[in-house]
Amino acid sequence: MRVILLGPPGAGKGTQAKLISEKFSIPHISTGDIFRANIKEKTPLGIEAKRYIDNGQLVPDEVTIGIVKDRLTKDDCDNGFLLDGFPRTVAQAEALDEFLKGINKELDVALLIKVPEEFILERMTGRRVCTSCGASYHIRFNPPKIEGKCDICDNELIQRKDDTEATVKERLEVYSKQTYPLINYYKDNGIISEVNGTESIDEVFGNISNILGRDK
């Protein structure tokens, strides 16, 4: 089972990726994680990627693709994988498809978790985190007993900079520009499947399991 996970920030991809990985016994490959691993291990590609990151530049496709290719050749990917955070562009998708075709491991499913923008805004801008113990809350879905105070240690709750409305809208705009062409690419290839990400975690995972069960 070879799967790509698509969806906007705040769609719950991380939660679903963990559940998919456990149920279908395939590694969850996050591009952020493999970048950090390569940089930490000082691999040639990691050193090159760090040079761009340290200079505040985007890591070029050839470096990103090289790091992903290297990860996909590991033994734990023999029976499949779940890619999260890659590809981000059609050019990356084409390079990935060419590589996978060459090793006889073409993609089975591009899984899109769909969530309306207003739902994401409410979900992300309502998040609060404790400045001391790191406990997470949501002003609507999981509020603290006392407004602005952590239930566990009574310290102040704050909104992270990443969760302000302006930042969330900016991230959603970047996602739209990057990902809509990618969604159309996988639609044209006939492998995209969509799930409604506004339902509960269990309901979303149930729908995903049905889709992946069909494609096994």
Curated annotation (Swiss-Prot):
Database matches in Gene3D superfamilies: P-loop containing nucleotide triphosphate hydrolases
Pfam families, per database record: ADK (PF00406), ADK_lid (PF05191)
Annotated positions binding AMP: 31, 36, 57-59, 85-88, 92, 160, 171
GO biological process: AMP salvage
Binding site for ATP: 10-15, 127, 136-137, 199
A GO molecular-function annotation: adenylate kinase activity
UniProt pathway annotation: Purine metabolism; AMP biosynthesis via salvage pathway; AMP from ADP: step 1/1
Keywords: ATP-binding, Cytoplasm, Kinase, Metal-binding, Nucleotide biosynthesis, Nucleotide-binding, Transferase, Zinc
Region of interest: LID: 126-163
Record-listed E.C. numbers: 2.7.4.3
UniProt superkingdom: Bacteria
Keyword field contains ATP-binding: yes
Subunit: Monomer.
The record's note on its domains: Consists of three domains, a large central CORE domain and two small peripheral domains, NMPbind and LID, which undergo movements during catalysis. The LID domain closes over the site of phosphoryl transfer upon ATP binding. Assembling and dissambling the active center during each catalytic cycle provides an effective means to prevent ATP hydrolysis. Some bacteria have evolved a zinc-coordinating structure that stabilizes the LID domain.
Family the entry assigns: Belongs to the adenylate kinase family.
Function comment: Catalyzes the reversible transfer of the terminal phosphate group between ATP and AMP. Plays an important role in cellular energy homeostasis and in adenine nucleotide metabolism.
Name the UniProt record assigns to this protein: Adenylate kinase
Species this chain originates from: Clostridium botulinum (strain 657 / Type Ba4)
Gene it is expressed from: adk
